[in-house]
Curated annotation (Swiss-Prot):
The keyword Coiled coil does not apply. NCBIfam families: plsX. Its main location: cytoplasm. Its EC number is 2.3.1.274. One of its GO terms (cellular component) is cytoplasm. Keywords: Cytoplasm, Lipid biosynthesis, Lipid metabolism, Phospholipid biosynthesis, Phospholipid metabolism, Transferase. Homodimer. Probably interacts with PlsY. The keyword Lipid biosynthesis applies. GO terms for biological process: fatty acid biosynthetic process; phospholipid biosynthetic process. It comes from Enterobacter sp. (strain 638). This is Phosphate acyltransferase. GO terms for molecular function: phosphate:acyl-[acyl carrier protein] acyltransferase activity. InterPro entries: FA_synthesis (IPR003664), Phospholipid_synth_PlsX-like (IPR012281).
Length: 344
């Protein structure tokens, strides 16, 4: 494995350095070839590195940043006033070639705008999309996009997302001739917004896309499609609803029957069932797949959940490592060139 360097916006997210710095140390423990540039306030970061050993410190560098973009800041205002912020500096490190990817749990709109401004979209792509790969009940994976980068999407953008998602599924996930579906309120062709119906027509006529039609939200984890496409508003709401239900389910499995007087053998049986079911469904835990790639850029940018805990942010760092190792932007660009040529 070759050495690689990532830039972390350690000030972003709901918990900032208290989560991101320990996560960085955890990532270093897991990958001996990893070097991390911690972008943020040195006075805040340095005390959190007290437990880092010499070997870890040799693969860490603090890059000072004057300020942080607030999570509730309007993207347009944040971008105009972004100079000196941890998010912008982390992206600049990627642009300058000092880092191979950026990871941030900060303001999604600002990250999208700054990344597009500084790293530029791949030729043929109008706007990048946030994408993640979710596990489904058939023990396979489904590529889902957009998850919040673009609240409003026209039919052309949805079709471009479908192409990018299809290429990602084939080139990175390893799915041959991936099935592509549009998220909609019904499977009938007359259902949904104009943009969705128009995107469906575009995808039907695209020879390189294996378009299978509409899919409803309750079938997200069924494995009926390999790529699911939607606008950022719908995708974000769908993903967070699913995550909330999964967290509640896993929590109920662990707490079921607590505090009640029950025969000893029933207690043992319940504990066995709880452990068994928790193991069976643990792959659905949102912490296991935190980190959405901002797909369609000339560089690698990973967006972590703002509310990510230490384990979840570590997973986001691991996602960045995998994206760099698999050369996602380069492979997407190469495939898009041929795909878009065939679609013309």
């Amino acid at each position: 494995m070759t050495r690689l360097t990532l830039a972390l916006d350690v000030m972003g997210g709901d918990f900032g350095p208290s989560v991101t710095v320990p996560a960085a140390l955890q990532a270093l423990n897991s990958n001996s070839q990893l070097t991390l540039l911690l972008v943020g306030n040195p006075d805040t970061i340095t005390p959190l590195l007290a437990k880092a050993d010499f070997e870890q410190r040799s693969r860490l560098q603090i890059i000072p940043a004057q300020s942080v973009i607030a999570s509730d800041a309007r993207p347009s205002h944040a971008i105009r006033n972004s100079r000196g912020t941890s998010m912008r500096i982390a992206l600049e490190l990627v642009k300058e070639g000092r880092a191979e990817a950026c990871v941030s749990a900060g303001n999604t709109g600002a990250l999208m705008g700054l990344a597009k401004l500084m790293l530029k979209p791949i030729q043929g792509i109008e706007r990048p999309a946030l994408v993640t790969v979710l596990p489904h009940q058939q023990k396979g994976k489904t590529v889902v996009l957009d998850l919040g980068a673009n609240v409003d999407c026209d039919s052309t953008m949805l079709a471009q997302f479908a192409i990018m998602g299809s290429v990602l599924a084939e080139e990175v996930v390893g799915i041959s001739n991936p099935r592509v579906a549009l998220l909609n309120i019904g499977e009938e062709e007359t259902k949904g917004l104009d943009s969705i119906r128009e995107a469906a027509e575009l995808l039907k006529s695209a020879p390189s896309i294996n378009y299978i039609g509409y899919l409803e939200a309750n079938e997200l984890l069924t494995g009926k499609t390999d790529v699911l496409v939607c606008d950022g508003f719908t995708g974000n709401v769908t993903l967070k609803t699913m995550e909330g239900v999964v967290r509640m389910f896993l929590s109920l499995l662990k707490s079921q029957g607590e505090g009640k007087k029950t025969a000893w053998w029933l207690i043992l049986l319940k504990r066995w069932l709880q452990k068994s079911l928790t193991r069976r469904f643990s792959h659905l835990n949102p912490d296991q797949y935190n980190g959405a790639c901002l797909l369609g850029l000339r560089g690698t940018v990973i967006k972590s959940h703002g509310a990510a805990n230490q384990r979840a942010f570590t997973v986001a760092i691991e996602q960045a490592v995998q994206a760099v190792q698999r050369q996602v932007p380069q492979r997407i660009a190469a495939r898009l060139e041929s795909v878009l040529a065939k679609s013309d």
